[in-house]
């Protein structure tokens, strides 16, 4: 097994700024995982981008009175700024309206088509009677015909987990305007999932390490596999590269067909932009490489069924066989890591209903790491979780400020005041050895949790060590030792021990709190970049594509991407010995305490009772 890890992160729609519910599901968990893997020595490739096709963008563009391209350009830039500000360490965060993405998507489609896994059928398509526009499956809701649950979507019922078609729903209505959709006959290309069922089942049944809810849901999908439409009656999207279809401006590829291909196209673009066009193959063609996919629970289907099926069919590994195409044998996901929903006042975040906290506003007032901490320790890892300002304030004040911030501040302050540097320790007592051993053992405990995407378990144990370190200082009472010259060696030993544990805890918390970790690194008298920050880079869409493809965008558009030189950072998953004699400076406050009243009212821009 090599040590290359692909971290594929769900693509956010470019139809509005991101709110904290979005980043709780796909953003922070994936970054914690990627940062830990890099610190452990893995060669990580973390990719994503803005999803700029599909009806959601058309609907929003209509609302704002702008073209879809204008809308996508604006929100692509806003989302890039949001995610970079949060410290998400993408090797490449790009977009789906690039020449490269069009070409790669069309290559995947043609491979599936030539292998017989894209079939033409006449289906019943839903359209809006008032606009004539196609309604996506997810924009139609009704009663599930199988279990009777209300609120079932046109693609699946979350209550029973069964796949549906919009025409299956009882009393279907459009989520856009509440009208009853009209169903018309239309011809589409469908992914022949039944022909790939055995291959999908064989792959899924080997996924022993997945979160139980994700694996159970994915296995249930196999029970009623039907061909699924991969084209849509829509004028905004990627053209269908088949004779007789490619010039039809009213039919495009389904947004979810092209979005999941984005993990591959982004990897190819990353390789080009870093000067080694073949480098992507190390993560995609080498079966020893691993790939982890992060998303919210509503997107499991596309990552544990649709995307693996596309990959299997492209390589001719279904019942119809077929050949391997130009991109070679491509790796299927090692694990699909899904989070539940972050809610507010018991409801899903909704901009239209005013139930929303935007990332941009949150970062401006509180910075990135308090939000990252909250999502890690109290977020929707395994269950839907309600965000409240009261809990946010309580956790920041009691855990981050009083716990971690206090440990760093008082340890470094006492060492600086009494020695001006990291002191030389004397003989260690059993108490010293115990806390040092606890901190060292935590690398294994927290590392094991992070390697298996158990982020809440990992940060809980790391903060337990912080608590043990604070208890150690309270027990040793170095402020009393400082008043007795005969206890100077013991004072030096206690403070050296505490500084070492601070250093250890900083390593443990780095994947979660990279911005604070850099501050602590400097507070301990160390130079250089400990935890690298992502950078926003303006690029030009000038990438050569072969084959050219159908209807691809013209070269020359410029757009922002997120990249970063993470290989140059010093952070590693191991004890970093504190060196006696290292100069210290008076520490600055690490984490500002919040006004408790904020927990009752919320900030002006997101009040508790709007």
Curated annotation (Swiss-Prot):
Gene name per UniProt = metG
Query: Where do we find the motif 'KMSKS' region here?
Result: 348-352
UniProt KW Ligase keyword: yes
**What processes does the entry annotate via GO biological process terms?**
methionyl-tRNA aminoacylation
Native source organism of the sequence = Corynebacterium diphtheriae (strain ATCC 700971 / NCTC 13129 / Biotype gravis)
Q: What is this protein called?
A: Methionine--tRNA ligase
The protein's job, in short, is: Is required not only for elongation of protein synthesis but also for the initiation of all mRNA translation through initiator tRNA(fMet) aminoacylation.
Give the required cofactors: Zn(2+)
Subunit info? Answer: Monomer.
């Amino acid at each position: 097994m090599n040590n290359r890890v692909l971290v594929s992160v769900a693509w956010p729609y470019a139809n509005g700024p991101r709110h904290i519910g979005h980043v709780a599901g796909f953003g922070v968990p994936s970054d914690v995982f990627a940062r830990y893997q890099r610190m452990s020595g893995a060669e990580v490739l973390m990719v994503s981008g803005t999803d700029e096709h599909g009806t959601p963008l058309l609907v929003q563009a209509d609302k704002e009175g702008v073209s879809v391209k204008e809308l996508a350009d604006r929100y692509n830039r806003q989302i890039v700024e949001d995610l970079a500000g949060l410290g998400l360490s993408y090797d490449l965060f790009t977009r789906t309206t690039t020449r490269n993405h069009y070409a790669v998507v069309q290559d995947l489609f043609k491979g599936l088509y030539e292998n017989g896994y894209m079939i033409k059928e006449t289906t019943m398509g839903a359209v809006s009677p008032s606009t004539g526009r196609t309604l996506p499956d997810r924009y139609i809701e009704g009663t599930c015909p199988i279990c009777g649950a209300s609120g079932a979507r046109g693609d699946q019922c979350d209550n029973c987990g069964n796949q549906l078609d919009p025409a299956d729903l009882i009393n279907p209505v459009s989520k856009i305007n509440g009208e009853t959709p009209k169903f018309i006959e239309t011809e589409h290309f469908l992914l022949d999932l039944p022909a790939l069922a055995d291959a999908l089942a064989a792959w899924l049944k080997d996924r022993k390490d997945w979160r139980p809810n994700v694996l159970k849901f994915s296995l249930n999908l196999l029970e009623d596999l039907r061909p699924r439409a991969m084209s849509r009656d829509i004028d905004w999207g990627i053209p269908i590269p088949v004779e007789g279809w490619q010039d039809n401006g009213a039919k495009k590829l389904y947004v979810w067909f092209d979005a999941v291909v984005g993990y591959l196209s982004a990897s190819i673009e990353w390789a080009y932009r870093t000067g080694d066009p073949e480098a992507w193959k190390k993560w995609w063609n080498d079966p020893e490489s691993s790939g982890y996919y992060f998303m919210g629970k509503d997107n499991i289907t596309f990552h544990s069924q649709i995307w693996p099926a596309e990959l299997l069919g492209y390589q001719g590994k279904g019942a119809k066989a077929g050949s391997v195409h130009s991109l070679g044998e491509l790796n299927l996901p090692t694990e699909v890591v899904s989070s539940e929903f972050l809610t507010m006042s018991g409801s899903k975040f909704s901009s239209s209903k005013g139930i929303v906290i935007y990332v941009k506003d949150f970062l401006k007032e509180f910075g990135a790491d308090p939000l990252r901490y909250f999502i890690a320790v109290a977020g929707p890892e395994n269950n839907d979780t309600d965000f409240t300002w009261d809990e946010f304030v309580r956790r920041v004040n009691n855990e981050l400020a009083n716990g971690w911030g206090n440990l760093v501040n008082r340890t470094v302050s006492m060492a600086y005041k009494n020695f001006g540097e990291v002191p030389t320790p004397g003989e260690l007592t059993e108490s010293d050895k115990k806390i040092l051993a606890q901190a060292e053992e935590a690398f294994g405990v927290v590392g094991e949790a992070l390697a298996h995407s158990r982020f809440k378990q990992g940060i809980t144990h790391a903060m337990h060590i912080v608590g043990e370190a604070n208890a150690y200082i309270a027990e040793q009472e170095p402020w009393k030792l400082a008043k007795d010259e005969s206890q100077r060696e013991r004072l030096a030993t206690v403070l050296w021990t505490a500084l070492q544990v601070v250093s250890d805890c900083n390593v443990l918390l780095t994947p979660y709190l990279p911005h604070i970790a850099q501050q602590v690194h400097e507070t301990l008298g160390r130079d250089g970049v400990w935890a690298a920050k992502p950078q926003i880079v303006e690029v030009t869409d000038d990438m050569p594509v072969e084959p050219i493809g159908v209807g691809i965008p013209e070269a020359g558009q410029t757009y922002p991407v997120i990249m970063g030189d993470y290989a140059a950072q010093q952070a590693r998953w191991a004890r970093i010995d504190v060196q006696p004699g290292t100069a210290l400076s008076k520490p600055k406050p690490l984490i500002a305490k919040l006004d408790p009243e904020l927990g009752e009212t919320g900030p002006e821009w997101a009040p508790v009772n709007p």
